[in-house]
From Swiss-Prot:
InterPro entries documented for this protein: Ribosomal_uS15 (IPR000589), Ribosomal_uS15_bac-type (IPR005290), uS15_NS1_RNA-bd_sf (IPR009068)
Its job: One of the primary rRNA binding proteins, it binds directly to 16S rRNA where it helps nucleate assembly of the platform of the 30S subunit by binding and bridging several RNA helices of the 16S rRNA.
HAMAP family: Ribosomal_uS15_B
UniProt keyword annotations, A-Z: Ribonucleoprotein, Ribosomal protein, RNA-binding, rRNA-binding
MF GO annotations: rRNA binding; structural constituent of ribosome
Cellular component terms per the entry's GO annotation: cytosolic small ribosomal subunit
Family: Belongs to the universal ribosomal protein uS15 family.
PANTHER family assigned to the protein according to its UniProt record, in alphabetical order: RIBOSOMAL PROTEIN S15, BACTERIAL AND ORGANELLAR, SMALL RIBOSOMAL SUBUNIT PROTEIN US15M
Oligomeric and partner information: Part of the 30S ribosomal subunit. Forms a bridge to the 50S subunit in the 70S ribosome, contacting the 23S rRNA.
Name of the protein described by the UniProt record: Small ribosomal subunit protein uS15
4Fe-4S keyword on record: no
Length: 113
């Protein structure tokens, strides 16, 4: 279940710094996002494809690591990339009373719970 060459080239042209830039973090994240979206449609129809689901989880984990790297190195590029891809972002903050990190969701999605 891979993307066609034309789709990959269009993603590289949109997110890359030039036409042959396939190694930058934002291009890799965009390619993984397209593959993940494609596989989610596949799993809506094939619910018992557990072997493929394992590969999907691996892709999601790899994208998360690339997003963490991009956030650490270039915050402005990270924010523009997730805005262009339509991804959610989680902001962790440390509560002064507890040592465990909490997720600040109300700021991001407007939800109150």
């Amino acid at each position: 279940m891979s993307l066609s060459t034309e789709k990959k080239a269009a993603i590289v042209a949109e997110f890359g710094r030039d036409a042959k830039d396939t190694g930058s973090s934002e291009v890799q994240i965009a390619l993984l996002t397209a593959q993940i979206n494609h596989l989610q449609a596949h799993f809506a129809e094939h619910k018992k494809d557990h072997h493929g689901r394992r590969g999907l989880l691996r892709m999601v984990s790899r994208r998360r690591k690339l997003l963490d790297y991009l956030k650490r190195t270039d915050l402005a590029l990270y924010q523009s990339t997730i805005a262009r891809l339509g991804l959610r972002r989680l902001i962790f903050y440390y509560d002064s009373k507890k040592s465990s990190p909490r997720i600040l969701r109300a700021f991001l999605w407007g939800c109150t719970r």
